[in-house]
């Protein structure tokens, strides 16, 4: 493909957009500039390929396609069937799964499909069988009332938020917390690692319908074989949310006991993050849950986004190429180089390092809250996000941690030497930032003091570091 093709495509697109609403075109240009000039260390972000991005910008956006392949509620969906089948095929082959459902719009949608598939299989289907009914519409009002009550009285066991779990795993602010009676397992207070004996004890005491594994801020591998054994011991369905580390599974960095697909009853994921695709979700499962999962529409979804499924097909095809395995290995090598560099400079990391794509810095050692550290780094051209640490004294808003991840910088081509240099920049900013005060003189958890000259100097150093690794080098918007 000609390098000029990508520039031509985006220049032409922006010209068309500018003719209608130039401010949108300006924002698109500004976003590219911002992404090119910032050290992006947000663990959940990446850079999708131009092919993936372009696959979303077409007339598939105009189609309704409620239903599944060959069974739509609308006519004229043959081309949607084609791209959905391609995306599902690539997902099955990439992850070694029996069944793939690629319609979810996001990770939470994928989780909701999985939750309701399990509820339908474990709760709804037995009720229908007892009532000798084929469909919920055939139930009497009394049976329907009883089923609704039973569906709302199920239990879920997942990782606690401050240990690195995710809001969508049954926590009260999220809809999943209103669906399930949820309990959490944590990590060892000394090591920060999952204590599988403690998980087993919690499962025995709580007897959940669903045991969830997966994380958004846990910097180590999870032994899914052990987790499946725990689930089996209490009759729970074992679900894994691999949204954060799907790229490491796809790239065969996580194998054996650390690959969730052979061990879980059902697996969910996003298609962005370390998988480097469009924003969206997917569900993987075996034949026993496939029929229920395919009822995601209308059970949870109003219908798929065909243009995003087209982009999923492209991104999943890219992930099946041999060079993706090298990319996945470099993500982890870069994360470990960043973590090691921070440790050598005296930073405190949760669990003392990383086995995956992220590290979690406890910034209380610098005398800061996560919010103060996040903003000071942003002022200096380093984009991160604040995150709670285990037993966090500052809560989920101000936090005591900063989460850093390497998928995006690895996509740009940065290596271990550059991540070592990034550790120095982070340490410099955090060491030279101090807490600020409120107007009444009381200590602030949000305000901070950083010499603008330091921020400018680090910004310049970050720009110099990125100069050799241009983002979307084939795209010149003029």
UniProtKB/Swiss-Prot annotation:
The record marks 272 as: Plays an important role in substrate specificity. It catalyses: (6R)-5,10-methylene-5,6,7,8-tetrahydrofolate + glycine + H2O = (6S)-5,6,7,8-tetrahydrofolate + L-serine. GO terms for biological process: glycine biosynthetic process from serine; tetrahydrofolate interconversion. Signal peptide: none annotated. Its cofactor is pyridoxal 5'-phosphate. Pathway: One-carbon metabolism; tetrahydrofolate interconversion; Amino-acid biosynthesis; glycine biosynthesis; glycine from L-serine: step 1/1. Its main location: cytoplasm. One of its GO terms (molecular function) is pyridoxal phosphate binding. It is an enzyme of class 2 (transferase). Keywords: Amino-acid biosynthesis, Cytoplasm, One-carbon metabolism, Pyridoxal phosphate, Transferase. (6S)-5,6,7,8-tetrahydrofolate binds at residues 161, 165-167, 291. The modification N6-(pyridoxal phosphate)lysine is found at residue 273. GO terms for cellular component: cytosol. InterPro entries: PyrdxlP-dep_Trfase, PyrdxlP-dep_Trfase_major, PyrdxlP-dep_Trfase_small, Ser_HO-MeTrfase, Ser_HO-MeTrfase-like, Ser_HO-MeTrfase_PLP_BS, SHMT-like_dom. The keyword Magnesium does not apply. Its EC number is 2.1.2.1. It is found in: Cytoplasm. Pfam families: SHMT. Catalyzes the reversible interconversion of serine and glycine with tetrahydrofolate (THF) serving as the one-carbon carrier. This reaction serves as the major source of one-carbon groups required for the biosynthesis of purines, thymidylate, methionine, and other important biomolecules. Also exhibits THF-independent aldolase activity toward beta-hydroxyamino acids, producing glycine and aldehydes, via a retro-aldol mechanism. Belongs to the SHMT family. PANTHER family: SERINE HYDROXYMETHYLTRANSFERASE, SERINE HYDROXYMETHYLTRANSFERASE 1. Homodimer. This is Serine hydroxymethyltransferase. It comes from Salinispora arenicola (strain CNS-205).
């Amino acid at each position: 493909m000609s390098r000029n093709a990508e520039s031509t495509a985006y220049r032409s697109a922006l010209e068309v957009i500018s003719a209608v609403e130039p401010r949108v075109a300006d924002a698109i240009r500004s976003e590219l500039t911002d992404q090119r000039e910032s050290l992006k260390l947000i663990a959940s972000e990446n850079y999708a390929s131009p092919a993936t991005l372009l696959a979303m910008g077409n007339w598939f956006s105009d189609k309704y396609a409620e239903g599944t392949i060959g069974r739509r509620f609308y006519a004229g969906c043959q081309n949607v069937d084609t791209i959905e089948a391609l995306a599902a095929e690539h997902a099955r082959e990439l992850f070694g799964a029996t069944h793939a459902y690629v319609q979810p719009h996001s990770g939470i949608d994928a989780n909701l499909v999985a939750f309701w598939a399990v509820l339908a299989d474990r709760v709804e289907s037995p009720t229908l069988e007892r009532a000798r009914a084929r469909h919920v519409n055939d139930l009497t009002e009394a049976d329907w009332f009883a089923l609704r009550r039973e569906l709302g009285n199920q239990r879920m066991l997942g990782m606690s938020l401050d240990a690195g779990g995710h809001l969508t795993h049954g926590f009260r602010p999220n809809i999943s917390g209103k669906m399930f009676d949820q309990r959490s397992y944590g990590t060892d207070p000394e090591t920060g690692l999952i204590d599988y004996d403690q998980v087993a004890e919690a499962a025995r005491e709580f007897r959940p319908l669903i045991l969830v594994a997966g994380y958004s801020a846990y910097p180590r591998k999870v032994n899914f074989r052990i987790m499946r054994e725990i689930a089996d011991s209490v009759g729970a369905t074992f679900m894994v949310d691999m949204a954060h580390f799907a790229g490491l599974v796809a790239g065969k960095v996580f194998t054996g006991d650390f690959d969730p697909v052979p061990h879980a009853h059902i697996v969910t994921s996003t298609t962005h993050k370390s998988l480097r695709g469009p924003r969206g979700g997917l569900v993987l499962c075996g034949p026993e849950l496939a029929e229920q999962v395919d009822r995601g529409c209308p059970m949870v979804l109003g219908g798929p986004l065909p243009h995003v499924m087209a982009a999923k097909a492209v991104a999943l095809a890219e992930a099946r190429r041999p060079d993706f395995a090298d990319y996945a290995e470099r993500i982890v090598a870069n994360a470990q180089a960043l973590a090691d560099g921070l440790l050598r400079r005296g930073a405190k990391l949760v669990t003392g390092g990383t086995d995956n794509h992220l590290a979690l810095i406890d910034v209380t050692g610098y005398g800061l809250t996560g919010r103060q550290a996040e903003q000071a780094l942003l002022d200096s051209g380093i984009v991160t996000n604040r995150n709670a640490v285990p037993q966090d004294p500052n809560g989920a808003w101000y936090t005591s941690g900063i989460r850093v991840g390497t998928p995006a910088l690895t996509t740009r081509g940065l290596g271990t030497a550059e991540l070592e240099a990034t550790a120095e920049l982070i340490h410099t900013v955090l060491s030279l930032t101090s807490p600020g005060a409120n107007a009444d003189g009381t200590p602030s958890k949000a305000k901070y003091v950083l010499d603008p000259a330091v921020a400018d100097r680090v910004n310049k150093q970050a720009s110099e570091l990125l100069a050799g690794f241009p983002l979307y080098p084939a795209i010149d918007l003029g």
